[in-house]
Amino acid sequence: MSDDRRRGDEDGGAGTGVITKTKPKTKKPSLYKVLLLNDDYTPMEFVVHVLERFFNKGRDEATVIMLHVHQHGVGICGLYTYEVAETKVTQVMDFAQQHQHPLQCTMERE
């Protein structure tokens, strides 16, 4: 081999450089409050049932939330990611409509 080739291969063909490891920055997803709105027609027992069925609340906690909705006009059912909150709102609205109750359920960003 010629001397020129040997000199060019002194570093084994690998260039010098700095390897940096970057840590991906993951952002926590935004949370959304699922809210029940009070009305004068939906029975309180139906609201308790909705909270138990769709939000996994125990009887006592569901009753407390229902009374809060009744007294204050609105109450928080839970905090969820956008997709989960949207699904729960749809489920509650469909269920209320099937049972001919005007119960309203909405979501808003935390």
Swiss-Prot record:
Disulfide bonds: none
InterPro entries to which the protein is assigned, alphabetical: ClpS, ClpS_core, Ribosomal_bL12_C/ClpS-like
Region (Disordered): 1-27
Single biological process term from Gene Ontology: protein catabolic process
Pfam families linked: ClpS
Listed Basic and acidic residues bias regions: 1-10
Homology family: Belongs to the ClpS family.
Role of this protein: Involved in the modulation of the specificity of the ClpAP-mediated ATP-dependent protein degradation.
Known partners and oligomeric status: Binds to the N-terminal domain of the chaperone ClpA.
Entry-linked NCBIfam families: PRK00033.1-2 (NF000669), PRK00033.1-5 (NF000672)
Name this polypeptide is given: ATP-dependent Clp protease adapter protein ClpS
